[in-house]
Amino acid sequence: MSRRALLALLPGLIAGCGGGRLLRPRTAASNPTLLENARPGTSDWELTGPAVDREIEGYASATSVDRGAGIDLYVSTAEPAYTVDVFRMGWYGGAGARRVAGPIERPGRAQPMPAPDPVTGLMECRWAEPHHLRTADGDGPWPSGVYLARLTARASGRQAYVVFVVRDDTRRAALLFQSSVTTFAAYNNWGGRSLYAFNSAGAPARAVSFDRPYAMNPYGVPLDGAGDFLRRFEYNALRWLEREGYDVAYATDVDTHRRSDLLPRHRAFLSVGHDEYWTWEMRDHVEAARDRGVHLAFLGANASFWQIRLEPDASGAADRTIVGYKDGAAADPLAADPARARRVTAHWRDGPTARPEAAMIGVMYVADPVDADVVVDDASHWAFAGTGLARGGVLPGLLGYEVDAIASASPPGLARLAHSPFALASGESGYADMTLYQAPSGALVFATGSMYWNWGLDDYNAPGLRSARASVAAQRITHNVLDRMLEGAGGA
């Protein structure tokens, strides 16, 4: 479809935005996200025969690339041939994706399982003969977004994904959506080792690699190579943002780590869902952006809980290895070096780091597993405009799985929007908080205090993996916050 044809469709698309949000046509016509979602989508992107015993699997040479650049897909299958289809994930009228390439025919090759490093437990693949994929076609470079390459073994029909992000390093989109790939990798137990004991064979690893396929997410749900993107929170938020016509560009937290100039190119930064693992550089860059007036929206919980370091892989490729000693931080090589002890891979709020995440976010992690309701506290706040909610009103089922609360390190002037009680199976109980504050720069910082908030935005995965929890009120609140950020009205 030509750009002219797409522009002709815009009035209908604008009128059909699901949350009642109006986009000025003169603005919409230059909104690449809206134009992209006017293109024909497909529902053929989902797996019809997911791999069950590693019949086919793969990983990408980078977590993200700039649009038009190349990326290598490393694939292992014992079958003689496989195909690759590539999809950009979005709304597309509810179809959920657009096919941008494929099917591409490839010869199969069984790749070796690496041995774990005897000291750190690192599992790093060094596979051969990748498929080189250029993120461009006859229409030009692909638009920024989250992409899934679907691998299909020809003989058996077994399938798996490889996930990667396409950036747009030249465009100043209103919103920057960060995919939290370091958290995907921390929980990934492919080969038998993750940063966690619960899904590791023996002790948890002290280092994990992006140079391997994704095996499972934190909750044991098979992800078929897509990391934590599809089955938990990020895809729900992405679908809603693109459905509602927001101007969005995409990056990963590795990009946030690398580039101090990334966030200031955008009006607001979105941390979505489960964003648990942060480097010192990530924290510096996000706080510096806030202090320059970039708004922050934390649509999740448990963000910036553990500090990690990024190191090269065995080939020298930068930022492919995540170091995280966590509860074993005393064994971290930096622990004995006073000059570098602040970078020890432990909790941000404790020890030599002593940089509580609540000072940035407004709240910080307090409990899991939680499955409860969000309870309104200050219903007079502008964030609740148009919701019809009063104090004590509830947003059913949107509090969980991990939740955050106000802490002593929270900034002064913090507005408590919701104060939600919860009870754990252990008998413990407490409260989680939704908050908003305004930094001295004028930047607004919003935190939902709940991972489940994204299920209020979009019902993908319901009822297959969870109950339906889409909430008109949650969508209106999110609109109110994002629109206030983008309009520059300010005021917490």
Can you say where each PLM-predicted feature lies in the sequence?
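N-terminal export signals
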Residues: A5-L22
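N-terminal pre-domain segments of enzymes
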Residues: P25-E55
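Contiguous beta-strand segments within globular domains
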Residues: E55, Y59-E79
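Aromatic-Pro/Gly-enriched surface loop or interdomain linker
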Residues: P80-Y82, V86-G90, A97-E105, S156-L262
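Extended acidic/polar, glycine-enriched regions
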Residues: Y82, M123-R171
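Catalytic cores of eukaryotic secretory-pathway lumenal/extracellular enzymes that build
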Residues: M89-Y92, A97-H132, R150-A153, L176-F177, ...
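Helical hinge/lid and interdomain linker segments adjacent to catalytic or ligand-binding clefts
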Residues: P112-P143, A226-P312, V472, G491
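Glycine-rich, aromatic-lined ligand/substrate-binding cores of catalytic
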Residues: R320-W455, D459, A474
